[in-house]
């Protein structure tokens, strides 16, 4: 990681990203600066969440900025690799995938402080009797997208550390595709338990979108590195600075 990366990471969030891209001249002479993210939630929620960033970047860069939702995690990777977008919000795993797919031509630009100590949670219905990871044996368990760091890769890693092999020890392994769908699968009873991004869970709780008297967290993972904003290496260095 570069000195720029560490400097920008300390600032975090919208101002961090905007200041990292503060050179307003676009060497590509493009009409629209395009931003996307791994689709952790419904497209409508992504558009709402990233709306302030779009407006801020438009003011800062002096050009039109468009948020472009993608269908799934691999699509976010391919969008940056093929330079269909300019800036992407990746999880740790999708960032690695993009680096590999591009031949090491994806550059991490910014990371929030909280993403250096990120966590996932496992949730279940409170009357299920599930209180530990070991009690997931023989149960139906859902992850998010197979390419999700916080919704699959890291939770699976911690399960393996606990001696649990999902395909061997669980009755069924499901993939919901997104964190909000993961929560819904537990609420509806389609699965017994599930793993997801802690920030999405906290937002659902804060917005009263889930009844924690019925569904709640029974395990929180240790911390790990996760999200970052990335650009293609072909973006001029002056722009990144």
Which residues fall in each region the model found?
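Periplasmic-binding protein-like
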Residues: 34-39, 114-121, 209-241
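General small-molecule cofactor/ligand-binding pocket signal
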Residues: 66-68, 173-174, 216-218
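Bilobed "Venus flytrap"/periplasmic-binding protein-like clamshell domains
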Residues: 31, 36-58, 70, 93, ...
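Short helices/loops that flank or line small-molecule/ion binding pockets
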Residues: 74-88, 101-102, 134, 178-199
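A ligand-binding cleft/hinge motif common to bilobed small-molecule-binding domains
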Residues: 92-103, 155, 160-161, 187, ...
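N-terminal hydrophobic or amphipathic helices and topogenic motifs
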Residues: 2-8, 15-21, 27-75
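Acidic, polar ligand-binding/catalytic clefts
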Residues: 78-135
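Short hydrophobic/aromatic-enriched beta-strand-loop microsegments
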Residues: 106-111, 169, 194, 214-217
């Amino acid at each position: 990681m570069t000195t720029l990366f560490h400097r920008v990471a300390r600032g975090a969030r919208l101002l961090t990203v905007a200041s990292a891209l503060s050179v307003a001249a676009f060497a590509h002479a493009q009409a629209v600066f395009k931003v996307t993210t791994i689709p952790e939630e419904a497209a409508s929620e992504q558009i709402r969440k990233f709306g302030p960033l779009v407006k801020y970047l438009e003011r800062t860069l002096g050009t039109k900025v468009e948020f472009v939702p993608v269908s799934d995690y691999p699509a976010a990777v391919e969008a940056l690799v093929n330079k269909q977008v300019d800036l992407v919000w990746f999880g740790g795993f999708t960032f690695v995938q993009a680096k590999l797919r591009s031949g090491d031509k994806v550059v991490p630009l910014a990371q929030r402080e909280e993403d250096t100590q990120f966590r996932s949670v496992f949730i279940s219905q409170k009357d299920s009797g599930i209180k530990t990871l070991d009690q997931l044996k023989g149960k139906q368990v859902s992850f998010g997208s197979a390419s999700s760091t916080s919704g699959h890769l890291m939770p699976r890693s911690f399960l393996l550390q606990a001696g649990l092999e999902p395909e061997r020890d669980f009755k069924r392994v499901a993939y919901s595709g997104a964190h909000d769908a993961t929560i819904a699968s537990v609420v509806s009873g389609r699965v017994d338990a599930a793993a997801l991004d802690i920030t999405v869970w906290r937002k659902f709780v804060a917005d009263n979108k889930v009844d924690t008297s019925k569904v709640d967290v029974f395990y929180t993972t240790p911390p790990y590195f996760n999200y970052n904003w990335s650009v293609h290496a072909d973006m001029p260095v002056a722009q990144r600075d």
